[in-house]
Amino acid sequence: MQDLSFEARLAELESRLAFQEITIEELNVTVTAHEMEMAKLRDHLRLLTEKLKASQPSNIASQAEETPPPHY
C-alpha cells in the first residue's frame, strides 16, 4: 500500500514537472518575442526622434543670443 502511494506521488510530481517545463518554454518564447519587439520599437523611436529634431529647429535661443534680464 505504501508503494502505491509512493508511486502515485512520484507520477504526480513527474507530471507536474513536465507541465512546468512546457510552461517555462512557452514563457521563454513569449519573453524573447517581446524583447525583439521592444528592440524594434526602440529603433523606431530613435529614428522618429532624430527626424523630429532635424525637421524642427529649436525656438530657444542660445545663452549667448539671449538678452540679459533688466536688473543687470
Swiss-Prot record:
<comment type="similarity">
    <text>Belongs to the SlyX family.</text>
</comment>
<feature type="region of interest" description="Disordered">
    <location>
        <begin position="52"/>
        <end position="72"/>
    </location>
</feature>
<feature type="compositionally biased region" description="Polar residues">
    <location>
        <begin position="55"/>
        <end position="65"/>
    </location>
</feature>
<dbReference type="Pfam" id="PF04102">
    <property type="entry name" value="SlyX"/>
</dbReference>
<dbReference type="InterPro" id="IPR007236">
    <property type="entry name" value="SlyX"/>
</dbReference>
<protein>
    <recommendedName>
        <fullName>Protein SlyX</fullName>
    </recommendedName>
</protein>
